[in-house]
Amino acid sequence: LEFRRVLFRSGKLAAEDANLSGGGVANAFSGAFGSPITAKDAPELHKLLTNMIEDAGDLATRGAKEKYMRIRPFAFYGVATCNTKEQDTLSKNGSYPSGHTSIGWATALVLAEINPQRQNEILKRGFELGESRVICGYHWQSDVDAARIVGSAVVATLHTNPAFQQQLQKAKDEFAKRQK
């Protein structure tokens, strides 16, 4: 019975993660972070994460996706995903590596740096975002594993960018003020 509950919770979370859009990445981490990450509640942090999405996602993964054009599990097996509206579009681009996972893991690394007191919860949530891609049939496990490496490399590279460093410091300062 407990196993069924775990499977149900995992499937429900995976379906929710499949619908990330707009501020969805920031919203997905609000619970793990311990406070809302919205443009209203944490404008500097929200801006930092919004700016990172393209770097960690499409820009970081597009080349490999185009080169390998690995078929996605749902297309390979002919089954539905957690969000059938995306299936047609996703079946036309490569599975390897997972852009969503790269974004999720990069976000987790940066948030854990800003709020180290909650790093376990944050990193767990980042890990779960990737696993959701496997549960929903969008990606193979190796797509997700590779994407975590990509996300880590993106964060390391972003730390050499003065604009990123400046925005990161603003987000850290904003977070510190909110903690007082």
Labelled PLM ranges:
Residues 128-159, 166:
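Interfacial helix-loop-helix junctions of multi-pass membrane proteins
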Residues 69-74, 144-152, 172-175:
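Short alpha-helical linear motifs
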Residues 154-180:
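C-terminal membrane module of polytopic membrane proteins
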Residues 1-135, 160, 167:
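Hydrophobic alpha-helical bundle signature of multipass membrane enzymes
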